[in-house]
């Protein structure tokens, strides 16, 4: 038997913080690829520390629903799961964006744990960001390949340089594809700042995609106000919104995109999980849902 455990931060203050985790778990559960699918959180129940005791399978794939390699993925989660012999070097990620997986024993439950790198640094996240950009303009009769820029927004922090590396990594990969005329990485807490997003683009239209797992205070309040979409998030704002001679198409957190379930699956597959055609089925289902939503908006 094999199980999948999706671990995420959660929040005592924002009940919507855990919604993407449960949604993606449900999507994967429906494929039947795993005998068990569980969710666990740092700030909600079920907690990291208890989740392995709820699993019957001997082989457990743990996928962190986090954006970057850092304190939570390298220290907190392995500690709370009681992974014997864990060392960050097991991930073989010297550049901060290349974590793969490590297979270890969980000391008190006699299970083999395949501990995966965070979803946010997986190559497939570039596809999710692009898909998110498509979603905000869907049904609006626009062509993203014509005079559109893409801003990928990260939190950023001087305390963990890896926080920014994931943002730059995906911005660079998307830029190389030539899908958008311009692609820039911007941040909340370091330069270049999202407050000045219009200064970094020549394109008239800019799609702004926050590389956050869930919608919350940052994505719903801080970023819209920082960019000048509105003076007060409670009054709402237009999409697109006119700011400094540009049209800003703001998408909200990328982690709510249905295709994120694909990234979770791919992390597990990279660690050795046998999922049959589940990856292809999830991709097909999420894109079909997108097509239906776009048609409904026409």
For every predicted segment, state its role.
Residues 1-298:
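Extended amphipathic ligand-handling, pore-lining, and cofactor/metal-binding catalytic surfaces
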């Amino acid at each position: 038997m094999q199980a999948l455990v999706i671990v995420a931060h959660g929040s005592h203050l924002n009940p919507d913080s855990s919604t993407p985790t449960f949604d993606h778990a449900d999507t994967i559960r429906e494929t039947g690829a795993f005998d068990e699918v569980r969710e666990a959180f740092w700030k909600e129940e079920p907690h990291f520390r208890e989740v392995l005791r709820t699993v019957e399978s001997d082989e457990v794939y743990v996928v962190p629903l986090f954006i970057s390699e850092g304190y939570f993925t390298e220290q907190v989660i392995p500690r709370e799961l009681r992974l014997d012999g864990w060392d960050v070097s097991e991930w073989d990620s010297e550049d901060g964006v290349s974590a793969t997986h490590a297979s270890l024993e969980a000391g008190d439950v006699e299970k083999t744990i395949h501990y995966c790198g965070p979803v946010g640094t997986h190559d497939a996240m570039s596809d999710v960001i692009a898909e998110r950009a498509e979603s905000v303009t869907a049904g609006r009769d626009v062509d993203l390949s014509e005079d559109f820029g893409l801003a990928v927004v990260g939190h950023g922090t001087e305390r963990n340089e890896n926080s920014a590396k994931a943002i730059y990594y995906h911005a660079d990969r998307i830029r190389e594809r030539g899908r958008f005329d311009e692609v820039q990485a911007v941040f909340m807490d370091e330069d270049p700042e999202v407050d000045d997003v219009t200064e970094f683009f020549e394109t008239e239209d800019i799609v702004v995609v926050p590389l956050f797992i869930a919608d919350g205070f940052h994505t719903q309040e801080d970023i819209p106000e920082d960019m000048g979409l509105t003076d007060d998030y409670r009054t709402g704002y237009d999409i697109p919104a006119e700011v400094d001679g540009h049209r800003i198409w703001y998408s909200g957190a990328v982690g709510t995109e249905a295709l994120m379930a694909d990234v979770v699956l791919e992390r597990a597959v990279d660690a050795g999980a046998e999922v049959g055609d589940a990856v292809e089925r999830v991709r097909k289902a999420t894109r079909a849902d997108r097509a239906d939503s776009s048609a409904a908006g026409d």
